[in-house]
């Protein structure tokens, strides 16, 4: 059960990290646009962009998960 949850989380983060979509921000019209609140889409876009910066750590996590699957969760 724990192994399935770890595998699900790992695959979900991998999917977010390898997306190659061009996620663009909205064009700002002037000085007053900075005061508006971020929408849910903006928050998701920022999260996916931040995942791209952690690709090396995600790769190390994948290697660790493969090791755990063989040693701990294998039968």
Curated annotation (Swiss-Prot):
Membrane topology: Single-pass type I membrane protein
Cellular location(s): Membrane
Keywords attached to this entry: Membrane, Signal, Transmembrane, Transmembrane helix
Transmembrane helix listed as a keyword: yes
Extracellular membrane side: 18-53
Regions that span the bilayer: 54-74
Signal peptide: 1-17
GO CC, alphabetical: membrane
Entry annotated with the keyword DNA repair: no
Cytoplasmic-side positions: 75
InterPro entries recorded: SMIM7
Annotated family: Belongs to the SMIM7 family.
Protein name listed in UniProt: Small integral membrane protein 7-B
Organism from which the protein derives: Xenopus laevis
Phylogenetic lineage: Eukaryota, Metazoa, Chordata, Craniata, Vertebrata
